[in-house]
């Protein structure tokens, strides 16, 4: 691991297979949906209106988009007519708000894992209407000897954590390779190969088998096309890309068949990684070596701080750092850090314009620190699901866009985590 002093602490984090390796202690997350409760926070004054009925949607172990699709189908409503502020975790018990035009009448739903409750009127909800989220998270499987260390961590939790984009943002990244970066560098074949051959364990067997076949027979598009027909593959992405490659063997042209939603995901993943790297570099200027802790994740390492000087905290708590976008003029500290990170990536600012078919890098600013509000820390109790172990529940609010899992990592620095297997 280069550029990490031996004085700095290092932990290995693997969110993708839902386990985290640290000092030899254990904890368990999401053993049941009620262990991870998420509640949307919205300003009802800002969404005031009379065009739609406003509903509270409570779901358990269901993805938001699947819940929306179910509601649309059940009540014969076009999916586009369901307004929402954000998407919520699947493996959780979540509450969020949706709006549906009044012309569809007053709706109600009360099923074991899905409940729709009419609570009033509003305008049509959009993603920007979300203020934040309230989390109530129960951590289980704790050993008695680890409790003093955890208590020490919790004392400093009010100072928050770096506001990193967490692993959930990087589902399209494999072996630390970004599709967007490969496109920028003109490696179109590699970009297509990542897309057509790499897969997550959670993908359907039909698609995993297809990707393994494509990988094994890479370049033999006639043979791959026959496999697609024989196995009745319906996905337009694979059908159209392989058909184009069979016809022209043009990898750049094949990428044009990727839908816009996926293209945005690829660009956002790389831009988010670059932002993480910039913030990590910035924090090195403020955090002494002995207070640094590193976690390994899909894209490299994330640097946390064990504690932070109050004077430094006051400097950073409201400070923002911009995303990297080629059409923006940066200056001072920001320019210095961005140039250093791009140099490490083997890129220039101008080359980011080569993103081409995938879209563009969008400029925005994001707070450097994620600071939990209304933080409540429960007592250590006997864990009824893990004999001889302990549990604790944390409750806190975060601004929209911040990841609850980052705060959990900060709270349990030095504790080995094992999440529920999917």
Swiss-Prot record:
Listed GO MF terms: pseudouridine synthase activity; RNA binding; tRNA pseudouridine(13) synthase activity
CDD domains: PSTD1
Active-site residues (renumbered): 89 (nucleophile)
Pfam families from the UniProt entry: TruD (PF01142)
Keyword presence, tRNA processing: yes
Domain TRUD: 160-371
Gene3D superfamilies per record: 1.10.1510.30, 3.30.70.3160, TruD, catalytic domain
EC number: 5.4.99.27
Primary enzyme class: isomerase
GO annotation terms (biological process): pseudouridine synthesis; tRNA pseudouridine synthesis
Catalytic reaction annotation: uridine(13) in tRNA = pseudouridine(13) in tRNA
Keyword Ribosomal protein found: no
PROSITE patterns hit by this protein: TRUD, UPF0024
UniProt keyword annotations, A-Z: Isomerase, tRNA processing
The organism's place on the tree of life at top rank: Archaea
Family membership: Belongs to the pseudouridine synthase TruD family.
Function: Could be responsible for synthesis of pseudouridine from uracil-13 in transfer RNAs.
Protein's UniProt name: Probable tRNA pseudouridine synthase D 2
Provenance organism: Methanocaldococcus jannaschii (strain ATCC 43067 / DSM 2661 / JAL-1 / JCM 10045 / NBRC 100440) (Methanococcus jannaschii)
Gene: truD2
């Amino acid at each position: 691991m280069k550029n990490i002093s031996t004085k700095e602490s290092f932990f290995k984090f693997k969110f993708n297979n839902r386990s985290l390796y640290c000092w030899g202690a254990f904890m368990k997350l999401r053993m049941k949906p009620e262990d991870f409760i998420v509640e949307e926070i919205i300003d009802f004054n800002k969404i005031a209106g009379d065009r739609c009925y406003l509903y509270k949607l409570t779901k358990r172990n269901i993805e938001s988009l699947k819940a929306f699709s179910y509601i649309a189908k059940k009540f014969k409503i076009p999916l586009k007519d369901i307004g929402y502020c954000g998407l919520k975790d699947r493996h959780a018990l979540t509450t969020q708000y949706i709006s549906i035009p009044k012309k569809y009448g007053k709706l109600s739903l009360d099923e074991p894992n899905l409940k729709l409750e009419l609570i009033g009127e509003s305008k049509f909800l959009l993603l920007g209407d979300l203020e934040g989220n309230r989390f109530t998270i129960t951590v289980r499987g704790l050993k008695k000897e680890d409790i003093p260390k955890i208590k020490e961590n919790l004392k400093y939790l009010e100072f928050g954590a770096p506001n990193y984009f967490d692993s959930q943002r990087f589902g399209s990244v494999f072996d630390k390779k970004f599709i967007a970066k490969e496109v920028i560098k003109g490696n179109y074949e590699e970009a297509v190969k990542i897309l057509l051959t790499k897969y997550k364990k959670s993908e359907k067997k039909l698609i995993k088998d297809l990707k393994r076949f494509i990988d094994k027979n890479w370049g033999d598009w006639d043979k791959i096309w026959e496999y697609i027909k024989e196995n009745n593959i319906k996905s337009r992405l694979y059908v159209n890309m392989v058909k184009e490659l069979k016809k022209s063997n043009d990898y750049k042209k094949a990428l044009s068949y990727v839908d816009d939603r996926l293209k945005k995901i690829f660009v956002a993943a790389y831009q988010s990684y670059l932002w993480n790297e910039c913030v990590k570099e910035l924090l090195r200027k403020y955090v002494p070596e002995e207070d640094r802790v590193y976690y390994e994740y899909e894209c490299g390492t994330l640097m946390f701080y064990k504690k932070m000087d109050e004077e430094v905290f006051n400097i950073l708590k409201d400070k923002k750092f911009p995303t990297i976008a080629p059409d923006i003029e940066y200056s001072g500290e920001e320019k210095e850090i961005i140039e250093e990170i791009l140099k490490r990536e083997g890129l220039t600012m101008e080359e980011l314009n080569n993103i081409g078919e995938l879209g563009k890098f969008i400029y925005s600013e994001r707070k450097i620190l994620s600071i939990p509000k209304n933080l409540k820390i429960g007592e250590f109790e006997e864990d009824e699901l893990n004999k001889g172990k302990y549990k604790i529940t944390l409750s806190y609010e975060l601004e929209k866009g911040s990841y609850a899992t980052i705060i959990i990592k900060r709270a349990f620095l030095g504790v080995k985590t094992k999440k529920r297997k999917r």
